[in-house]
């Protein structure tokens, strides 16, 4: 769960 991997999401 890396928010940085999916910035748009």
Curated annotation (Swiss-Prot):
Name of the featured protein: Unknown protein 4
């Amino acid at each position: 769960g890396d928010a940085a991997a999916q910035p748009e999401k």
